Amino acid sequence: MKTALAALIVGYGLDLLLGDPSFLYHPIRVIGNLIALLEKWLRKVFPKTPNGELAGGVFLVILVCLAGYGVPALLLFAAFKIHPVIGFLLEVLWCWQIPATKCLKDESMKVYQKLKENDLPGARYAVSMIVGRDTENLSETGVTKAAVETIAENTSDGVIAPLLFLALGGPALGLSV
């Protein structure tokens, strides 16, 4: 779409300024629900063998990627047919929702602030909100390492990759991978 770059700039600007629009259901939750539903169905369809599980997994990836691209592409097509401004606003909305820059910054700064205040229990709690491991017994160094590691990983997964795919293929590609 001709407006994709402008929508990316506006949407990413909104992400930097405002963070995720919490008043909306996030597309990643929709995709997660789709995965759970399809996985349940595919476990009934494919045999419970290593090859059956592999085939079901491949089928799941293909279906989710197709739906993740196809549904947004169709919705954008329809929105642009109704009116170009509606299509542009939908593109902006998705370009706002997909990256997680401000959210990542805000959550990581909570860890930094607690460490700065010498509040190790608070820092452990703050880092537990962004990592997938037990933080109860982490030292100050452990909290710092966990925060840096997750910031690096999530910068790749939640900022750089989404921006790359949004730039390459607009919101439809950004939502599909």
Description of each model-found segment:
Residues M1-S176:
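Hydrophobic alpha-helical transmembrane segments
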